[in-house]
Amino acid sequence: MAKPYDPKDFYYRKAKKQGLRARSAFKIEEILHRHRLLGRGDAVLDLGAAPGGFLQILAEAVGEKGVAVGVDLEPIRNLGKRWVRTAIVDLLAPDALDKIRLLHDGRFRLVTSDMAPKTIGIKVTDEARSLELVRMALSVAEQVLVPGGAFVAKVFMGGDFPALKRELQGRFAAMHVIRPEAVRESSYEVYVLGTGFRGRAAAVAPAAVKAEAPRAPAPPEQAAAPEEATAPATRAARQKPAPAKKPAAAKRPAARKRAAKKPARRA
């Protein structure tokens, strides 16, 4: 049986001692240490940023020449750094991207998400809701990442997790599953990391290829397309003799001759 969550565990106390807002700060710190995702002057977007644990580490990583944007449904207390910008944003709202672009009108080198659903204790349901949040974050990332950028998101591993991995593999050059040391022993959360973003067009292509791959007759269908394209020309070629119905025109004079002969007989 899993150990009950102790809010005052080692990482909780360590975070408080270092002035960090949440123990999650150590998770993103470890990921950044293991993978070079950000540099000074870069722009980073943190989704579900409250209370600001991730954002504190990300802001330090990009420095004062960079931009760190954090959005959440809850207000995020000011970090006291001019290059950190926050806002209350509902990612499901149609104007979510517009609000994000008001904070930074360029693209981002990294998009992170530490969002988690309100768990109800039913593992299958919690996993499904977690996957929904990751896919929502990924949808935002696809629209704001620079080519070659990276995506990090927390997810409860299980259920449809293999499908999520395939989605990430189709969108990024490399995909990793990371379990930072700061994750509670009883938790089944991990972080997925995609690096080398290929762009939105590439994100659609792999899925299309997989959908078409099982169709063995696909090449013949492609060959049939030109035939359909040329079919009207063939029909037109067959119809070319139609205007030249000169035999009918030739019969008309004959009919006139017969009509002319009739009066002669009467005479």
Curated annotation (Swiss-Prot):
Residues 212-252 have a biased composition (Low complexity). Residues 212-267 are annotated as: Disordered. It is an enzyme of class 2 (transferase). Residues 253-267 have a biased composition (Basic residues). Belongs to the class I-like SAM-binding methyltransferase superfamily. RNA methyltransferase RlmE family. Its EC number is 2.1.1.166. S-adenosyl-L-methionine binds at G52, F54, D72, D90, D114. Keywords: Cytoplasm, Methyltransferase, rRNA processing, S-adenosyl-L-methionine, Transferase. This is Ribosomal RNA large subunit methyltransferase E. It is found in: Cytoplasm. It catalyses: uridine(2552) in 23S rRNA + S-adenosyl-L-methionine = 2'-O-methyluridine(2552) in 23S rRNA + S-adenosyl-L-homocysteine + H(+). One of its GO terms (cellular component) is cytoplasm. GO terms for molecular function: rRNA (uridine-2'-O-)-methyltransferase activity. HAMAP family: RNA_methyltr_E. It holds the Pfam family FtsJ. Specifically methylates the uridine in position 2552 of 23S rRNA at the 2'-O position of the ribose in the fully assembled 50S ribosomal subunit. The keyword Transferase applies. Its main location: cytoplasm. The active site is at K154 (proton acceptor). InterPro entries: RNA_methyltr_RlmE, RNA_MeTrfase_FtsJ_dom, rRNA-MeTfrase_E, SAM-dependent_MTases_sf. The keyword Ribosomal protein does not apply.
